[in-house]
Amino acid sequence: PCCGSGGMFVQATKFIEAHGGNTKAVNVYGQESEPATYRLAKMNLAIRGISYHLGDKAVSTFSDDQHKDLKFDYIMANPPFNLKKYAEYGEFETDPRWKGYGVPPASNANYAWILHILNKLDVNHGIAGFLLANGALDDSDTLEIRKRLIENDKIEAIIVLPRNMFYSTDISVTLWILNNNKKGGPWHGRQLRNRTGEILFIDLRTWNSNIYEKKYVRLTETEKIG
């Protein structure tokens, strides 16, 4: 929904290649509101031979969804944190993407991103991962939306990441995982247990051994989680 220059798509493709997957079977869809960044994303993907669909123009995904009738198996996003002035379009109050959850605050787009992403997921097995500022976890103005997300069993995991993960800011952020199907069963060669009614919480803020290097979750640390 806010693909920027397409860096996430490039890295996702590299991940698929590294794990023996078929990148030709992957269709990439994205949208970007800034014209210069939109053009850069198209160039970035084209020179790497990645098949992409970024809509017909650079425009906000809230006011003009370029993939309006599509649902997706997987969604990744790193939306602008605490975006203001995103709700300046005529149908904001009655936007069908908010149905069943309530209208998100017009002064902060955090929960508008969440509800938009949830709306775009395949209803049977869609999974999303996206980053938000930590303040989204306890924002009093969005309490009812969070309550309904939990009641509808849409949240798979909340992972608070270490500080200094970004070059532009030293704040800690949260990785949200949404899942439309937390039931157990076979999945890409693995057998998943039933996680219905469960939410995994992980706080990684103490993993801060070197504040001068950008962080990667090391194998020993993933073993601690497992």
Which residues does each PLM region occupy?
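Conserved SAM-binding motif I beta-strand of class I
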Residues: N27-E32
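A conserved structural/catalytic subdomain of Rossmann-like adenosyl-cofactor enzymes
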Residues: D69-G226
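Conserved SF1/SF2 helicase motif Ia
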Residues: G20-K24
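S-adenosyl-L-methionine
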Residues: S33-L70
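Aromatic pocket-lining residues of Rossmann-like dinucleotide-binding sites
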Residues: A12, I16
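Class I SAM-dependent methyltransferase "Motif I" SAM/SAH-binding loop
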Residues: C2-G6
